[in-house]
Amino acid sequence: MKNRDVNRMTKALGLRRKIIGVRFLYFKHEYDKLSVEEYGRKTSYCMMVKHAMEDNCFKAKLENFRCRCALEALGLDEEMECVESGQRYYSLNLYESRAVAKDVTKDISRIKQKIYGVQLGPLEQLEDADVAIFMVNAYQLMRVVQGYTYKWGIPKNLYMAGNQGVCADLTAGPFEKNDMNFSVLCAGTRKMCAWEDDEMGVGLPIQQFEPLTEGIIQTMNYIDYPTQKDQISERLDDPMELGVAVDKNVHYGKLGKPYVRPSVYEQLKNGELE
């Protein structure tokens, strides 16, 4: 089912990069027993995420992390005391006062329990992923939000500060809050990973992936216009690959007209419409 949904979401949205999974490895013996290649270098966590999106599956532990903030966000090391006080962020001259810096720090997600390592790779290759992450442009993000609201209503756990865009916004946050989040990323990951200017990220707990995919597809025919539907059709190997056929003859703009025209609505209320 996971492989099918990865394919369906990728083709429905036209994603440029692979959807990846992140699995948290709590114990050393669990990490050692996992028979996937070790990352073998020391970089930022967001560079690991991009490496996974390039069709690589691997595991990494504390020694592979160059970014202190990611280590703490993902639970691989304890926070320094300067974190909760806001001193770390205030020292960067990104916030007007220590109070603002402390408030921002408080709301940046961090996994509280100790974690030994992580496994990353294309989602279809991870048996027990905890979080799914993928990159989108603005139109694709609109469709993700529409798919989410189809299933769960308006997202109520969205948060970002323009910092720690991958480690906190897309990984720790969805896991800790048990809900989808999206992020405009941060300057650090945009520089190191060379994301395109129009790219943003989506992270969600793994159990939301299948229903989110379904929500995106169930709203496709009613929201996407013929131009987008043509592009979707071109990506498909089979007309029923998404589970529903692409239909250029329907659109939500053609529906519900009695509910936007007062005079027609009166007829509806009075039983005068067939």
Locate predicted features.
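Acidic, serine/proline-rich low-complexity intrinsically disordered regions
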Residues: 3-274
